[in-house]
Amino acid sequence: MLVLIVNIKAKSEKTELIKTELLKLVEETYKEVGCTKFDPHQEEEDPSSFWLYEIWETEAHWKAHMETEHVKHFLAFFDENVEKFDVRRAEKLI
């Protein structure tokens, strides 16, 4: 099992665009083989910050996800619209 916590910090004027595109990404991602969880969150104190909690059956499933057209579309506009993007791996303790 692969657990990822992703932080996406939108440029303040691009918050709604990132939110819209992120929700499209979620819909497509849940159709993928190996996706156990792909849940987006928006910070209450800083609405331009989004968090994704992802669980994949294997790293190979996640790598295949990163090569899909919907992920490539989402990543294509990062330079102009995203201030920060960070991916962290986590290990379930229990």
Question: Residues of each region from the PLM?
Answer:
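Absolute protein N-terminus
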Residues: 1-2, 94
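Active-site-flanking beta-strand signature of metal-NTP-handling nucleotidyl enzymes
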Residues: 2-8
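Short, surface-exposed ligand-recognition loops at beta-strand->loop->(often short) alpha-helix junctions
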Residues: 10-15
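Short amphipathic alpha-helices within nucleic acid-binding modules
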Residues: 16, 57-67
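Short amphipathic alpha-helices in soluble, non-transmembrane regions
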Residues: 20-23, 66-70
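Short, glycine- and small/hydrophobic-rich beta-strand elements in well-ordered beta-sheets
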Residues: 27-49
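Glycine-rich beta-strand-turn "strand-cap" elements at beta-sheet edges
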Residues: 40-45, 75-94
